[in-house]
């Protein structure tokens, strides 16, 4: 369960207005990680990369800072990058080796950028 915020500044007035809408039209379609890095020779084009803005919004709405975000289909690590940016921890699973390699790269970059000590699926114990 997500804790009620004791600090109203955690959700801005504009965020509340945007999020209360029935349709989220402010999500940029091009705000995605590079899924081409995870594509193998025999793969077809990934036709539906997930927008980071949507992921960030859902992570912020349904988790608290410090909690774990789990993605059973981690892909190139979009959920993990968004989770780390928002101060959450991340665990993910991915079966495809090319996506695992891309996710490792994206998560390492996010860990450096957001100076997190959180462990990810790809961190060494």
Language-model-derived ranges and their functions:
Residues 1-125:
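Class I S-adenosyl-L-methionine
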